[in-house]
């Protein structure tokens, strides 16, 4: 019966638009295998961690992370702030959206960066929580 109710909720819930990304808010958030705090906690996502929205229920959101894993998170733990996570071993963040532009800083794999501006091209303007801004190649990050 429990499984049947769960299945009904999944079918009845409106599916999120493909490519809708959110981020974990100001505090780390537990990620569950079902939409309940009584479910198994899979891992704790760090603050500002980007996630792709898959399904939304009233108080819960099913998300996909950078590794492709699916989990449930309480909606109250999500933020509308757009972030990306570095997937390259080391991403160059440059002053302009050009390969030859001055290097502002480098970000290691797993570092979350706030999206300031989504360009139509191959670059994304980002903000490091240390205050530095610059452009990173879109193929070096996940969350777009």
Language-model regions: role of each:
Residues 1-5:
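Positively charged n-region of N-terminal signal peptides that target proteins for export
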Residues 16-33, 41-49, 54-132, 136-144:
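SH3-family beta-barrel domains
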Residues 12-14:
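N-terminal signal peptide c-region/cleavage motif recognized by signal peptidases
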């Amino acid at each position: 019966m429990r499984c049947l109710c769960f299945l009904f909720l999944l079918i009845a819930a409106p599916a999120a638009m493909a490519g809708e990304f959110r981020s974990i808010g100001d505090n780390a958030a537990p990620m569950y295998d079902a939409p309940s705090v009584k479910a198994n906690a899979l891992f704790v996502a760090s603050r500002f961690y980007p996630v792709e929205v898959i399904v939304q229920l009233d108080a819960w959101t099913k998300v996909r992370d950078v590794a492709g894993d699916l989990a449930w998170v309480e909606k109250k733990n999500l933020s509308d702030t757009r972030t990306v996570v570095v997937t390259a071993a080391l991403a160059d963040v440059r002053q302009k959206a050009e390969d030859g532009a001055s290097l502002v800083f480098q970000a290691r794999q797993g570092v979350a960066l706030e999206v300031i501006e989504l360009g139509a091209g191959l670059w994304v303007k980002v903000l490091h929580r240390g205050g530095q801004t610059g452009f990173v190649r879109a193929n070096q990050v996940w969350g777009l």
